[in-house]
Amino acid sequence: MSTIAEAFSTLGFTYTDELKGVGGEVPNWRSIQDVQYLKRKFRYDNQRKVWEAPLCMDTILEMPNWCRGGLDIQEGTKLNCENAIMELSMHEEEVFDKWSKVIDKAYAKATGDHLDINTYRGYAQERYLEYYM
């Protein structure tokens, strides 16, 4: 971690680890599972043998609550909900199953429409094709 802080320093930035260090100190190293960057942690998917970088749950669950100005409110909300569900697919399958249903049900209740969403494995396949092929 200290090499990251040094590299940021050469660019005129001050790197602060997400834990804010102990007494302002940045640890020399940490396991990748202990690192968080821009609200993303790292987890290894043993079944697929790949690393994922899931966004923190609080951020994902906030996504449907916001809509950019200039967008149709329903279409903007739909896109945010679908993006939130895609982000959920980088978490464990049980997390995806639980929260994707909650989000889709809430959207359907509010609009009478359903989201265009993929399955857990479908999102994994999309990522594989996009990043590894």
Q: Which sequence ranges carry the predicted segments?
A:
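Active-site and adjacent loop segments of nucleotide-processing enzymes
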Residues: 2-6, 10-14, 19, 24-133
